[in-house]
């Protein structure tokens, strides 16, 4: 039932007028099973996990996208097919590829600047959207994890796994980092965030010189606006600073980039969970992490 054929059968039963020949199951997406129809349509089926109500989050995502579709400066998915129970849906595929750091670095300076400025416009719009846009049927609104929650997960779930392949000094830096993260106070304001604005979800146009779209709003939540700037530090300090300056030109949130750096350091540590799948990238990450953590801890004692 969960394979490509089974999911395609569900699509045909729900939408008999939608003609397609090929259904391919994508292995991308931890929170959804994704089926690509004729390389033209993307259908997403939320996974149900213990402690999470992914179908409810999916319906909240659909409501948010419907609100953004006509006003966003960057294309977002437009769901043209939604099952009667709101349990799955499909949109016309946005042609593009993930904006990997190497592709971003290969662009002209003007193209990079234009992309960052458009993303700043997008974030201003998204962050000004009332959080009620993602409220579930009972009124609940998903919230970003606190630093203390990330610290507790590190201790309970992640530390022992990562300790197997990092040396003692680096592990000690990680422990100090998570304690610092847990001690971080609340942000000056909370907004509706994308929640997972990484290279996987920012698509470059086929010409690799502009943005084709932003996808996967399934982790949208109420949280720190700095969280949506996190991944841009993977494009370099200059890119993150440009985005922060365009997003907050009056400097009303002077700690914005510092909080993004903390979040980025946590993101880099979390990447070590994929060590076995990406040995070359992991070797480089292990070489970079001591300096990155020292820098973050020095800036955030």
Model features per residue range: what roles?
Residues 2-20, 95, 106-117, 125-195, ...:
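An alpha-helical support segment within catalytic cores of ATP-dependent transferases
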Residues 4-5, 62, 241:
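Short, surface-exposed alpha-helical segments at coil->helix boundaries
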Residues 9, 66, 245:
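Active-site phosphate/pyrophosphate- and oxyanion-stabilizing loops and adjacent acidic/basic residues
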Residues 21-145, 169, 187:
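ATP-binding pocket architecture of kinase catalytic cores
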Residues 30-37, 43, 176-227:
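Active-site acidic catalytic loop and adjacent metal/ATP-binding pocket
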Residues 46, 69, 103, 215, ...:
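Short, flexible helix/strand-to-coil boundary loops that buttress conserved ligand/catalytic motifs
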Residues 48-51, 144-155, 226-233, 257:
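Nucleotide-sugar-dependent glycosyltransferase catalytic core
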Residues 219-301:
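Helix-rich C-terminal or lid/interface subdomains of diverse kinases
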């Amino acid at each position: 039932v969960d394979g490509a054929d089974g999911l395609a059968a569900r699509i045909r039963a729900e939408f008999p007028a939608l003609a397609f020949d090929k259904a391919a199951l994508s292995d991308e997406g931890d929170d959804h099973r994704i089926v690509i129809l004729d390389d033209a349509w993307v259908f997403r089926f939320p996974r149900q996990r213990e402690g999470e109500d992914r179908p409810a989050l999916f319906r909240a995502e659909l409501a948010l996208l419907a609100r953004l579709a006509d006003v966003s400066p960057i294309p977002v998915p437009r769901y043209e097919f939604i099952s009667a129970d709101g349990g799955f849906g499909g949109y016309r595929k946005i042609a593009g590829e993930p904006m990997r750091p190497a592709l971003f670095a290969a662009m002209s300076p003007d193209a990079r600047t234009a992309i960052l400025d458009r993303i700043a416009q997008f974030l201003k719009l998204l962050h000004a959207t009332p959080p009620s846009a993602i409220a579930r049927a009972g009124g609940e609104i998903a919230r970003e994890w606190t630093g203390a929650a990330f610290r507790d997960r590190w201790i309970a779930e992640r530390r022992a796994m990562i300790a197997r392949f990092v040396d003692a000094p680096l592990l000690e830096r990680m422990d100090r980092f998570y304690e610092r993260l847990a001690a971080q106070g609340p942000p000056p304001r909370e907004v509706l965030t994308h929640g997972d604005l990484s290279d996987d979800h920012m698509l470059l146009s086929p010409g690799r010189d502009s943005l084709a779209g932003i996808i996967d709003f399934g982790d949208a939540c109420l949280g720190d606006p700095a969280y949506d700037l996190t991944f841009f530090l993977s494009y370099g300090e200059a890119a993150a600073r440009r985005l922060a300056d365009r997003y907050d030109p009056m400097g009303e949130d002077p700690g914005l980039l510092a909080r993004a750096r903390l979040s980025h350091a946590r993101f880099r540590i979390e990447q070590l969970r994929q060590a076995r799948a990406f040995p070359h990238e992991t070797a480089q990450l292990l070489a970079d992490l001591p300096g990155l953590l020292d820098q973050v801890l020095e800036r955030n004692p």
